[in-house]
A protein has these predicted regions:
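A basic- and aromatic-enriched beta-loop-alpha substructure that forms the phosphate/nucleotide-
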Residues: 60
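A conserved active-site cap/scaffold subdomain adjacent to cofactor or substrate pockets
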Residues: 320-328, 339, 344
Length: 471
């Protein structure tokens, strides 16, 4: 798949085989389908090229954008002329084979299986309370935003249905989409046998689909190298600006869980480098693994969810598909197509890495900048709240989601809680009355009781602190 899409990218550039032979840096985005001993070197051998530099990246939704930015900086320094970034996953095939009981064997496996390349381990409190899955953590951010806006439980989910229906319409026109099907907002927002609740407020049709077979490749070159290779001017799309920034590593560390200060920094940096404002953007692809990743980016840009420009050029990760760490390669490839069809326009592509921690924004246009865009400015270190493992007594719920089983029934509530002293921690609840209340009443902002129990904080709520929030 990697070789196929790189060959297609070379042909699409108009330079053909010469573009591949000119590649000085070949970056392969981390593959989750199976491990290789050295994916980038093996790919170079398959292509019959010998780039001086091969890179096997780490994980996360910002990885392709960071690889592009790093290549552009090497070009600015005169160290590189042509680079390639490629990603691919065959998770759908792997899962299908597993269901059928068929063995699979990866080519060129490492001598020993390597651990998943997390840059930062989970916090001990996250381990104790099983705060691992992205559908859980991003749901927590959405519930904090919902409470901050004062929107009812049902109303917020209806809004998510409208958001994803807009994306599904784009996916329906995308021949590369995994689910190229337009859906009505109510078909996305309403739980049912074929659209179960996953983690409130998310139904199945609101979450990224990773089990896809997809690959994408990008070829990057200096203006001079593109001239030498004979890339036609109408095939060129230029990086006009980039911004990178970090939010806190751990979910509970985020001081205001309803927004992303780092997104504002990164987006602002990309736009300033490009010399444009938000109103100058014609096309957007905002990282869309879950609702909060889209909403936080829209909020950071000052754009409403009903903006006529939309927020995706692919159809979004729930409909287009989210192939591991590689989605942004697909977004950038589709953005290049859009901009070729709309010469002179500007497009913005974002990436989100880990649990709302890493953020990358890149701005593009068919018009080159008068001068080379500056490197991303250094972003300030994020503010954090202290996270503790043990909670006891009265706390305030900062964010809360109910996880549902495959039958759609609620199984467990996970909450981020704050002590009177301002420390944060996690708590869980499985009481039937609590789970029922969480489906009827906004728990975020309410007081609750927590007691430690064998390394896990147990949350209880007597319903007395109901206030006025509701459905």
């Amino acid at each position: 798949m990697w070789a196929e899409v790189l060959g297609a990218a070379a042909a699409d550039s108009g330079a053909g085989r010469a573009a591949l032979e000119a590649v000085g840096s070949l970056a392969v985005v981390y593959c989750q389908t199976w491990q290789y001993d050295d994916a980038a070197t093996r790919l170079a051998q398959r292509l019959g090229v010998q780039p001086p530099c091969t890179v096997n990246t780490g994980i996360g939704g910002t990885v392709p954008a960071v690889a592009v930015v790093e290549a552009s900086e090497a070009m600015r320094r005169g160290e590189l002329e042509v680079a390639a970034v490629v990603s691919g996953e065959a998770l759908a095939t792997r899962r299908a084979r597993k269901r059928r009981g068929e063995p699979y064997r990866a080519s060129f496996p490492p001598p020993e299986r390597r651990p998943f390349p997390f840059e930062a381990p989970f916090h001990p409190a996250e381990v104790a309370h099983e705060v691992f899955q992205a559908y859980l953590t991003f749901a927590l951010f959405d519930t904090a935003r919902r409470a901050h806006l004062g929107v009812g439980l049902d109303g917020y989910r209806v809004g998510l249905g409208r958001l994803w229906a807009r994306a599904a319409r784009v996916a329906a026109a995308n021949p590369d989409a995994w689910f190229p099907e337009a859906r009505r907002p109510e078909d996305i927002a309403t739980p049912g046998p074929d659209n179960r609740m996953v983690a409130s407020p998310y139904t199945k049709r609101m979450v990224a689909i990773m089990d896809v077979d997809m690959a994408a490749a990008l070829l990057l070159a200096t203006h001079r190298a593109a001239d030498r290779l004979g890339v036609p001017p109408e095939r060129r799309v230029y990086l006009r600006g980039a911004g990178l920034a970090l939010d806190p590593t751990y979910v509970a560390e985020h001081p205001a869980m309803w927004r992303s200060p780092a997104m504002r920094v990164a987006a602002g940096g990309a736009l300033r480098a490009a010399g444009i404002g938000v109103d100058d953007l014609a096309h957007l692809d905002l990282y869309s693994c879950f609702g909060s990743s889209v909403y936080f980016a829209l909020d950071a840009l000052g754009i409403g969810p009903d903006d006529p420009r939309g927020f995706t050029v692919t159809g979004g990760l729930p409909s287009h598909g989210g192939p591991g760490s590689g989605y942004v390669t697909h977004a950038l490839a589709w953005m290049a197509r859009r901009l070729r069809e709309d010469p002179g326009a500007h497009g913005l592509v974002s990436g989100v890495g880990m649990h709302m921690t890493k953020h990358a924004f890149t701005c593009w246009s068919t018009d080159p900048a008068p001068v080379a865009p500056p490197p991303p400015a250094a972003a300030p270190a994020p503010e954090t709240r202290p996270v503790v493992e043990r909670l006891e007594g009265t706390v305030t719920v900062v964010a809360a989601t109910v996880l549902h089983g495959r039958d759609g029934d609620p199984e467990r509530l996970v909450a981020v809680c704050e002590t009177p002293e301002g420390a944060r921690g996690y708590a869980v609840g499985t009481d039937a009355e609590l789970l029922a209340a969480a489906g009827e009443v906004e728990l975020v902002g309410r007081r609750a009781q927590v007691r430690p129990d064998g390394g896990v904080n147990r949350l209880s709520w007597d319903g007395g602190d109901r206030g006025s929030a509701g459905r």
